[in-house]
């Protein structure tokens, strides 16, 4: 029997390949960062060829460094940065423009046009999403409108659109397969998550030819096999795909309605499983597809926070008050509190539950006694405050009061942040033994499709807690601090508009 599953984890800043064994333990990994392009203020792009180059490179590298043969790989699972939009030429396989990244705000104007056309309620009710530049739909329109000859080629059926999963599967199979999974499709703002099909009315409003779109498949099924030239002659099933946040929900074994996880990465993303029920949000959350597995499609509520770990990168790269992200834990604990300082990291607007494309970052409450450590501490605290904003909306929408929150992602190794998170939520925070849950979720989805794991019960039994953080902060103090945060956010909202 084959011994391993390979997860390809194509993130916003790096491409990773991780090998997991039958126990769900990591046996090897390889990672490579790639270039971020910022052609104008608020614009973010990647080079699709570099995405593919780094992703295929780390896949080969992890096999070399572990000495594991392609013959021992039972399947490949893919997880990816969602919403990021790639359009390529069907005949040459070459992109016609850079990938427009989920963080990119250039299509805010197209979103305003959709609202002016009265499409907002329709989109909300049928895709589960808000009209925002974050999602793929307006990015596709922008490329078709701005790349010379693109619209004509698209109408002639010569162009293909895909989120990153589609682009990787297309390249792994050398152009034989053009598919996506339910979870990724549900983030395009083009997919009707009630009827489970591409939405003609939205495609028409954005003037996007249906022939460009990938076929939507289950999150756990064999889509195709690696081409012989991709992996030195190997024929490995590509058997699972899910957007990064849905993959993390699966990797955390949140299989029952009401179970939730928060992933702390570049942004922060909290998802709650709502089972086979489309739960509309009245509180600025998204309703999204969690996954399609075992012939069933399940839904989730999601709160997307645009800037979390990215704020720590900003402290390091732009303000240069830390050398690396790990320093923040020590420096934050060198001061007793944030000295009344609040950081609102709205560098690319505010996500859930505010959805304000025109909010901008702010540091408030500064006095002459404010030190670098206070700003560092306030930056970490901002991640926890934003999480509370989302959790309150989620409890309101679902009618479920959360007893504990499962956490994952890079920043969960920061004990200060995790303890403050438990304190400000007033809820137990569970950090699992394996924090690579995004890649693990992709591995589980692929493994289920090829019989490497029996069923979801077997997977649920593998989930083990590493550390439990229990709330210790006194209630009056907690609420006072949170009120201060809400005041700070209100100052940052709609900032850009005030110029006009």
Swiss-Prot record:
PROSITE patterns: FGGY_KINASES_1, FGGY_KINASES_2. CDD domains: FGGY_EcGK_like. InterPro entries: ATPase_NBD, Carb_kinase_FGGY, Carb_kinase_FGGY_CS, FGGY_C, FGGY_N, Glycerol_kin. The keyword Kinase applies. The keyword Kinase applies. One of its GO terms (biological process) is glycerol-3-phosphate metabolic process. Pathway: Polyol metabolism; glycerol degradation via glycerol kinase pathway; sn-glycerol 3-phosphate from glycerol: step 1/1. One of its GO terms (molecular function) is ATP binding. ATP binds at residues 12-14, 266, 309, 313, 410. Key enzyme in the regulation of glycerol uptake and metabolism. Catalyzes the phosphorylation of glycerol to yield sn-glycerol 3-phosphate. NCBIfam families: glycerol_kin, PRK00047.1. This is Glycerol kinase. The gene is glpK.
């Amino acid at each position: 029997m084959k011994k391993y599953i390979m997860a390809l984890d194509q993130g916003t800043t790096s491409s990773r390949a991780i090998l997991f064994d039958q126990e769900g333990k990591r046996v090897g990994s390889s990672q490579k960062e790639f270039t971020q392009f910022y052609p104008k203020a608020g614009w973010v792009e990647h080079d699709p060829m570099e995405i593919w180059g780094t992703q295929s490179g780390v896949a080969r590298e992890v096999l070399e460094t572990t000495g594991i043969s392609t013959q021992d790989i039972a399947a490949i699972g893919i997880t990816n940065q969602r919403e990021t939009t790639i359009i390529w030429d069907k005949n040459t396989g070459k992109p016609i423009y850079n990938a427009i990244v989920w963080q990119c705000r250039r299509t805010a104007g197209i979103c305003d046009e959709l609202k002016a056309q009265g499409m907002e309620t329709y989109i909300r009710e049928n895709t589960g999403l808000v009209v925002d530049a974050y999602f793929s739909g307006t990015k596709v329109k922008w490329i078709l409108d701005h790349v010379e000859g693109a619209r004509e080629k698209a109408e002639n059926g010569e162009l293909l659109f895909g989120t990153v999963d589609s682009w990787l599967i297309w390249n792994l199979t050398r152009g034989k397969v053009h598919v996506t999974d339910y979870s990724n499709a549900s983030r395009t703002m083009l997919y009707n998550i009630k009827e489970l099909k591409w939405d003609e009315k939205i495609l028409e409003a954005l003037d996007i030819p249906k022939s460009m779109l990938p076929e939507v498949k289950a999150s756990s099924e064999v889509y195709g096999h690696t081409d012989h030239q991709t992996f030195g002659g190997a024929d490995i099933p590509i058997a699972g795909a899910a957007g990064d946040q849905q993959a993390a929900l699966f990797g955390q074994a949140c299989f029952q309605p009401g179970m939730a996880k928060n992933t702390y990465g570049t942004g922060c993303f909290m998802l709650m499983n709502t089972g086979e029920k489309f739960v509309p949000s009245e509180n600025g959350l998204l309703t999204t597809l969690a996954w399609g597995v075992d012939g069933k499609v399940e839904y989730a509520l999601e709160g997307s926070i645009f800037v979390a770990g990215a704020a720590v990168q900003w402290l390091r790269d732009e303000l240069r008050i830390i050398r690396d992200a790990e320093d923040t834990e020590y420096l934050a604990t060198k001061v007793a509190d944030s000295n009344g300082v609040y950081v609102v990291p709205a560098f690319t607007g505010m996500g859930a539950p505010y959805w304000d494309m025109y909010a901008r970052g702010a540091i408030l409450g500064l006095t002459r006694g404010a030190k670098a450590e206070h700003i560092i501490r306030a930056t970490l605290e901002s991640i926890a405050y934003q999480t509370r904003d989302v959790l309150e909306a989620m409890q309101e929408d679902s009618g479920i009061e959360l007893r504990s929150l499962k956490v994952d992602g890079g920043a969960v190794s920061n004990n200060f942040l995790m303890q403050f998170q438990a304190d400000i939520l007033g809820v137990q925070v569970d950090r699992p033994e394996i924090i690579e849950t995004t890649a693990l979720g992709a591995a589980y989805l692929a493994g289920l499709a090829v019989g490497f794991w029996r069923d979801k019960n077997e997977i649920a039994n593998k989930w083990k807690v590493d550390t439990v953080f229990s709330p210790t902060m006194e209630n009056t103090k907690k609420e006072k601090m949170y009120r201060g945060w809400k005041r700070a956010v209100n100052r940052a909202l709609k900032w850009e508009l005030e110029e006009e």
